[in-house]
A protein has these predicted regions:
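Iron-sulfur (Fe-S) cluster-binding segments and ferredoxin-like electron-carrier domains
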Residues: 132, 190-193, 199-221
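Immediate flanking context of iron-sulfur cluster ligation sites
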Residues: 175-196
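ATP-dependent adenylation/nucleotidyltransferase module used to activate substrates
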Residues: 1-178
C-alpha cells in the first residue's frame, strides 16, 4: 500500500466508484471531489456520490463549475438539446462532448490535491471513452499528467488506472473490490430511473454483460 494520499475525481458512476475503492486499496488515505457543472444528470449522479461516500466513510468535496453550464454548449447540459439514444460511439454521442471538461476538473482537482498535501489525483476514464471524448484519450492524460506534475512542482501526479481497460473489465474489478453497483448512476438523462436507451445506459448494460455480472439497475424500459 502507498503511504500517501489520493484524491479521486468522483461522479458517482461505475468507473469512478471502482476508482474510489481501488484508491482506498492502493493508498493510505483517499478523498473524493465531485463537480456540479450544469449537466442534466448532475443532481442524480451527485446524490449517488454522496450516498456512496457516506457508506464508505470517505470525505467528499463538491465544487461548483457553474460557468460551464452558462457558457458552454453540449446536449449533456441542461441548456442543450436532447440526449441521443442508441450506441455509445463517436457518431452517436458527439453532441454530449463538454469542451475540455476533464481538463477543467483535473486542474481544479490538482490544485486541491496540492493544497491538501495529497500526492495523486485519480481519474476513472476507460477505452470506451477514447473515441468520443478527446479529454479521455491516453495522449490527453499524458499531457495533463505532465502539466500537473510541472505545475505542482512534482508534488502531485495524475493516475488513470483504467485508461486501457474496457468498462466490462472495470465492472469485474469493481465487483472484486466490493462495489455496490446498485448505488451508482450512469444515465445522462437524469430522470428518476435509468432510461435504458441513451448511450451510457446501453454501455452500462453491456459492461455487466461482458463481466458476467447481474445488472442491479432499475431501467424505465
Amino acid at each position: 500500500m502507498n503511504s500517501q494520499y489520493a484524491l479521486v475525481v468522483f461522479s458517482g458512476g461505475m468507473d469512478s466508484t471502482t476508482a474510489l475503492l481501488w484508491a482506498r486499496r492502493e493508498f493510505s488515505g483517499v478523498s473524493a471531489v465531485s463537480f456540479f457543472y450544469g449537466a442534466k444528470h448532475n443532481a442524480r449522479e451527485l446524490a449517488a456520490a454522496n450516498v456512496i461516500c457516506r457508506k464508505l466513510n470517505i470525505p467528499r468535496l463538491e465544487i461548483p463549475l457553474d460557468f460551464i453550464g452558462k457558457y458552454f454548449h453540449s446536449s449533456l447540459l441542461k441548456t442543450g438539446g436532447a440526449i441521443p439514444e442508441g450506441a455509445y460511439n463517436e457518431t452517436n454521442m458527439a453532441s454530449t462532448v463538454v469542451p475540455f471538461r476533464n481538463g477543467i476538473m483535473l486542474a481544479a482537482a490538482a490544485g486541491l490535491a496540492e493544497d491538501s498535501g495529497y500526492s495523486a489525483v485519480i481519474l476513472g476514464n476507460h477505452t470506451g471513452d477514447h473515441a468520443i471524448y478527446p479529454d479521455c484519450r491516453p495522449e490527453f492524460i499524458d499531457g495533463m499528467a505532465r502539466a500537473i506534475g510541472t505545475g505542482t512542482g512534482g508534488k502531485v501526479k495524475l493516475l488513470s488506472p483504467f485508461c486501457n481497460m474496457t468498462k466490462g473489465q472495470i465492472a469485474a474489478l469493481g465487483a472484486e473490490l466490493g462495489v455496490d453497483f446498485s448505488l451508482t448512476w450512469s444515465c445522462y438523462n437524469g430522470r428518476e430511473k435509468h432510461c435504458g436507451k441513451c448511450g451510457t445506459c446501453r454501455e452500462r448494460r453491456d459492461a455487466f454483460r461482458e463481466a458476467g455480472l447481474p445488472d442491479p439497475t432499475v431501467y424505465e424500459d
